[in-house]
Swiss-Prot record:
Substrate binds at D118, G119, S120, S121, N211, Y244, Y262, L263, Y264, K274. One of its GO terms (biological process) is fructose 1,6-bisphosphate metabolic process. It comes from Christiangramia forsetii (strain DSM 17595 / CGMCC 1.15422 / KT0803). Homotetramer. The keyword Magnesium applies. GO terms for cellular component: cytosol. Mg(2+) 2 binds at D115, D118, E280. This is Fructose-1,6-bisphosphatase class 1 1. CDD domains: FBPase. GO terms for molecular function: fructose 1,6-bisphosphate 1-phosphatase activity; magnesium ion binding. PANTHER family: FRUCTOSE-1,6-BISPHOSPHATASE-RELATED, SEDOHEPTULOSE-1,7-BISPHOSPHATASE, CHLOROPLASTIC. It is found in: Cytoplasm. The gene is fbp1. Its main location: cytoplasm. The lineage of its organism: Bacteria, Pseudomonadati, Bacteroidota, Flavobacteriia, Flavobacteriales.
Amino acid sequence: MERHTTLGEFIIENQKDFPYAKGELSALLSSIRLAGKVVNQQINKAGLAEILGKAGKENVQGESQAKLDVLANEIFVSTLRNRGEICGLASEELEDYLVFDEEMHKNAEYIVLIDPLDGSSNIDVDITVGTIFSIYRRISKKGTPATLEDFLQPGINQVAAGYLIYGTSTILVYTTGNGVNGFTFDPGIGSFFLSHSDIKFPKKGNTYSVNEGNYVHFPQGIKKYIKWVQELNEEENRPFTSRYTGSLVADFHRNMLLGGIYLYPQGTTAPKGKLRLLYECNPMAFLAEQAGGKATDGSRRIMELQPQELHERAPFICGNKEMVEKAEEFMQ
Ligand SMILES: O=P(O)(O)OC[C@H]1O[C@](O)(COP(=O)(O)O)[C@@H](O)[C@@H]1O
Ligand SMILES: [Mg+2]
Ligand SMILES: [Mg+2]
């Protein structure tokens, strides 16, 4: 029987891609793997462990937090705080970034941004959710506390990014700038194994993912693009199929494997869209580009946007290159 490579082996094997690396990034990816396992275990038994429902408080964006948003955040923060690979962390569920200034963190090279639980509206109804992470090398001097500047870096500075998808199976997908690979969790063994190597968007896609309930609020260009995808044109395989789960990770994963486009545009009610640039758009954009796809805000490359605030939002269009460029044409 063919033996699959474990995530741990793959991380070590690929450490050579980073001639300057001293193993910190590998150790950090392993910490994220560990936290992911713990969150996965909690999600699998959520209905029994009284961790469904609301936490009774709001995050900095005024969204009412789900108990699992809070728990997943605590698991990632405590796992990464207990291991010395990062000097700071920012999260969707925390108003401000955390500075890890204990001795073992002071000289750490990296910072992490996370969306601990993506697709929160789906938790209580057992639909696929995820965790998204983005890793940067610090800008501030080693030995000093992490600064806001360390977090407000453009997406092109990411050294690694990825997500965990908690679906029919649990898969960890990530890139370090050398392609995108996916590892499926085998609960029987308790390890992640390489199951999707060097993932690339298929040449063509015919699935579009957008919350059409917001159609009336969309800019004209997006309205026209949606009309275009729904028109009959057998040659161009239109109308496209509509698939929207309410979880960015799930829609992105499907579109990357089968071809498609995800759109969360700006609108009258959300002038800058809904998704957060630093821990949703940038990591997915890095993965998309590494898989041969594209990610824009309708006209500009997401990864070239200069962030101004920790929780700022950005219009997000991401998927097959050709499909994103068509949407951009309509936006022009
Ligand atoms: O319900 P809406 O407005 O369509 O938004 C759904 C989108 O918002 C998100 O749930 C935002 O992420 P969080 O759940 O992490 O807040 C995305 O996963 C999803 O694609
Ligand atoms: Mg999210
Ligand atoms: Mg979230």
